[in-house]
Amino acid sequence: MGLRRGANGPPFELSTQTVQGGLPCFLRRIQLKLRTLVLATSLSLGAFASANAGEVLNQIKSTGKLTCIVNPNSPGFSVPDSKGVFQGFNVDFCRMTAAAIFGDANKVEIRGVGFSDSLKTLIAGDAHMASRSITRTGTRDTEPGLSFIATTFYDGQGFMVPKKLKVSKASELKGATVCAEDGTTTLQSLADYFGRLKLRYKVQNIADKSARLQAFFNGKCDVLSSDFSALASDRLLAKNPADFTILADVISNEPLTLVSRPDKELESTIFWSLQVMLLAEEYGVNSGNIDQITANLSAAAPEVQRIFAKDQAGAEMARKLGISTTWAASIIKSVGNYGEVFERNLGKASALAMDRAKSPNRLVKDGGLLYAHPIR
């Protein structure tokens, strides 16, 4: 016998008939339907995840090249040579990734893209990764369509001024007009810094790099503010670089990070390729001795064997990612270890003449911030 809906009752019939376990029949039917729905949903989501796992990496393999975004004109970091081929510190991390995927560092298309368009290009799916001095922030990291992977350069924001202003520290910039790049973390850091000091200032937000530098070099701005690495690079573009000085004040921390489209396999390939470069430097493996070391791995340190031996962790990782088991050796042979990349593009013998011994971008054992995650 059931309870029938009355004038104020629920709009359904509630049966009191029960089954084993004490549940009314109608609740048992609902329970079974819910279980079926949950199982179907789980299977569907599992199939979706499987279908999309490694999708971007597979696309790269099928097209035969990696597409990588860099700054279009940043001496030391990314700049076309006389043949129009991009060279530089950031470019080498594009080449690192291509070497890992294909065993050939040249299977990469380098695209010079302005900052305001770089992340949009990735989100739109028009490139696979970016290596162009992009600061990792919370809001960027949680943006759909982007994966921030690993920091390649620890930087900070600073100021460049004409020497004729005779300014020696940032606290003397009261009332200054500052040229800065629109859409970057630079603007917020300026507001925070000058706000703390209660100093008046004006900002010229100029997205186009050429226009921004022209405004600064021609005296329309008193100050140029950006990451220290960018300021050092930009100063080389002045008619007379010696006319400008970079102040010592650091007003922010800027972890410059490799970014890709979301894809676990691609992210892992990029991340662990960088770890290979760091670990290789730590153990003295470089582009000049890699062949000798891999030919006599039994004499190498266990950590080195784990990277390069075909029956150890590095090779096991490669098989899971679907790349060659010689990926690590290809990276070092084609691009070099992290120290080689730094010195070649940014070090004392380069146009930027950075002293790595005074930089956070050295190994922890040398007093820096860099160390390799364990490959085991």
At which residue positions do the language-model features occur?
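Bilobed "Venus flytrap"/periplasmic-binding protein-like clamshell domains
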Residues: 67-76, 86-101, 135-136, 155-207, ...
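Extended ligand-binding regions for polar small-molecule ligands
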Residues: 92-101, 163-167, 171, 176-177, ...
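Short helix-initiation/N-cap motifs at beta->coil->alpha
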Residues: 108-120, 203-218
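Bacterial N-terminal signal peptides that target proteins for export
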Residues: 15-19, 26-38
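Bacterial N-terminal signal peptides
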Residues: 38-47
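Extracytoplasmic small-molecule ligand-binding "clamshell" domains
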Residues: 53-131, 323, 334, 338
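Acidic, polar ligand-binding/catalytic clefts
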Residues: 95, 99, 103, 107-172, ...
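Sec/Tat signal peptide C-region and signal peptidase I cleavage site
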Residues: 31, 48-53
